[in-house]
Amino acid sequence: MSITKDQILEAFAAMSVMEVVELIEAMEEKFGVSAAAAVVSGGAEAAVVEEQTEFNVVLTAHGDNKVAVIKAIRSATGLGLKEAKAMSEAAPVAVKEGVSKEEAEALKKELTEAGASVEIK
C-alpha cells in the first residue's frame, strides 16, 4: 500500500505547528538538508542584480583631429580653450562624471565623431 500526495497533505493539515516543526527537523536530519539554505541563496542573488545609473565618460585618446575634439570638450563641459586643450592632452581623463546613460551615450557619440577614442564606465 503506497501513500498518495493527497494523503500526505491531509496528514500535514491535521498536525499542530509544533508537530510540523518536529517533522521538518527530522526530515532535515534524515536527508542531510537544511530548509534555511534555500532562503539565504535567493536573497544574495537579488542584491547582485542592481543596474548602474551613473556613468563616467572617459577620453582615452584625442585622435588625429585634435581641434574638433577640443571643441567637443568645450561644448560638453563649458571649459575654456586652455582647459579643454589640457584635458584632451591628458588622456586618459574623465570628461564628465556621474551622468545619465543617455547623456553619456550622446557625449560619446559627439567625441567619437570628432575623432576621439572614448569609453563609458
UniProtKB/Swiss-Prot annotation:
Record's subunit section: Homodimer. Part of the ribosomal stalk of the 50S ribosomal subunit. Forms a multimeric L10(L12)X complex, where L10 forms an elongated spine to which 2 to 4 L12 dimers bind in a sequential fashion. Binds GTP-bound translation factors.
Family of this protein: Belongs to the bacterial ribosomal protein bL12 family.
Keyword DNA damage part of the UniProt annotation: no
GO annotations of cellular component type: cytosolic large ribosomal subunit
HAMAP family documented for this protein: Ribosomal_bL12
Gene3D superfamilies on file: 3.30.1390.10, Single helix bin
Annotated disulfide bonds: none
Keywords: Ribonucleoprotein, Ribosomal protein
Signal peptide as annotated in the record: none
BP term (GO), one: translation
Upper taxonomic lineage: Bacteria, Pseudomonadati, Pseudomonadota, Gammaproteobacteria, Alteromonadales
Coiled-coil regions, chain positions: none
NCBIfam families xrefs: L12
Protein name: Large ribosomal subunit protein bL12
